[in-house]
C-alpha cells in the first residue's frame, strides 16, 4: 500500500510505510529523539490538530522537551516570520501541518524546512490535509519526515496513516516504540536484543 501512496507525495517505491494513525506515528517519531541536551526545543502552533499537540505536550515534554508554542493572531494563519524566528540552534523538532485543519491555510513549508535545516533541526510535516488536494513532493520540499493519512482527501478508511522518512536520515533514527515487524527477520520470531531493518519498515511496530 505504501508504494501506492508514494507517487502521490513524490516518493520512490519502498520509501513509504503504513501505520495505524498519525498520533501514534508522532509518538513513535518522538521516541527516536533525545531531549536531554541544550537542543531540546520543539516549535509548533496552536493551529495544529489537538491530538498531535497532546502527544507532544505529554510524551515529548515527559522526555525533556521544551515546547515553544506559537499562537495564531487571527485563528486562520500562523505568521511565517514568527515561526522562522522561533526556530533557532536550540530547536530539535518542528512538527507542523502543511495545510491547517481549522482554516485550510497553506503554510510555507519549504521556507520553514530551509530555516530548520540551517540550524540543524528536523521537520515533521503533517500532510494529512494537503495530499489529495494539492501537489506534494517530498524531494522538492527536502522534508525530513512526512506523515499523513487516507481518511480525508484520499477517500480511504481509518487505519491508513503513512510515513515517509528521507532515506539519508532513516538509519539515524531508532524508535523506542517498536515491534516485531521492524525486525529484519520478523518471521524467525527471535527473542532478545532488538535489531532494526534499514528500509522504511524499520518504523513499523
Model-derived regions, located:
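Pyridoxal 5′-phosphate
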Residues: 1-205
Amino acid at each position: 500500500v505504501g508504494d501506492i501512496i508514494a507517487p502521490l507525495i513524490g516518493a520512490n517505491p519502498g520509501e513509504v510505510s503504513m501505520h495505524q494513525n498519525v498520533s501514534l506515528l508522532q509518538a513513535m517519531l518522538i521516541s527516536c529523539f533525545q531531549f536531554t541536551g541544550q537542543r531540546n526545543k520543539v516549535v509548533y502552533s496552536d493551529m495544529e490538530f489537538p491530538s498531535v499537540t497532546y502527544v507532544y505536550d505529554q510524551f515529548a515534554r515527559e522526555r525533556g522537551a521544551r515546547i515553544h508554542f506559537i499562537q495564531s493572531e487571527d485563528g486562520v494563519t500562523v505568521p511565517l516570520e514568527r515561526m522562522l524566528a522561533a526556530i533557532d540552534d536550540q530547536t530539535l523538532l518542528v512538527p507542523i501541518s502543511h495545510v491547517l485543519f481549522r482554516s485550510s491555510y497553506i503554510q510555507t513549508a519549504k521556507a520553514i524546512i530551509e530555516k530548520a535545516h540551517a540550524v540543524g533541526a528536523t521537520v515533521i510535516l503533517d500532510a494529512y490535509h494537503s495530499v489529495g488536494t494539492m501537489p506534494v513532493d517530498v524531494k522538492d520540499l527536502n522534508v525530513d519526515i512526512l506523515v499523513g493519512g487516507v481518511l480525508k482527501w484520499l477517500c480511504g478508511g481509518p487505519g491508513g496513516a503513512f510515513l515517509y522518512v528521507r532515506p539519508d536520515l532513516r538509519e539515524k533514527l531508532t524508535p523506542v516504540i517498536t515491534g516485531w515487524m521492524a525486525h529484519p527477520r520478523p518471521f524467525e520470531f527471535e527473542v532478545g536484543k532488538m535489531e532494526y531493518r534499514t528500509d522504511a519498515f524499520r518504523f513499523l511496530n
